């Protein structure tokens, strides 16, 4: 039976490149000259932003978003934490979401059932496996999920016929 997997993943290599480019842009921008501002990537899951002030953190967030979009990374996978300010400066943690959470996977399954397509969906950890008797049904399911607006980026892989 034909099947495919629905996943929500971020290419770690592209993420590293985007963070490096954002740091390079900080080094060349006039409004960040002589300022201790940095992006740091931890384990490919968390991006730490640090700068002297809250205002500069907001500017850095715009730079990060632009660099991620330029590298083809959907910014819906980012979860911005609160800005922590003290006398030494400001910090913000940006979490990169990987995988489909249980609640969101149930929403995807409900969307497929609601459309009454001849496909079955099952949740496998942080991904969703969709199977059907015909390839056309699977292609309709992919089109439906692409058209629907979920708060996370979806990729379709492991298409088997």
Swiss-Prot record:
Keywords: Nucleotide-binding. InterPro entries: DUF520, UPF0234-like_C, UPF0234_N, YajQ-like_sf. The keyword Protein biosynthesis does not apply. GO terms for cellular component: cytosol. Disulfide bonds: none annotated. SUPFAM superfamilies: YajQ-like. The keyword Nucleotide-binding applies. Gene3D superfamilies: 3.30.70.860, YajQ-like, domain 2. GO terms for molecular function: nucleotide binding. Nucleotide-binding protein. Belongs to the YajQ family. HAMAP family: YajQ. This is Nucleotide-binding protein XAC3671.
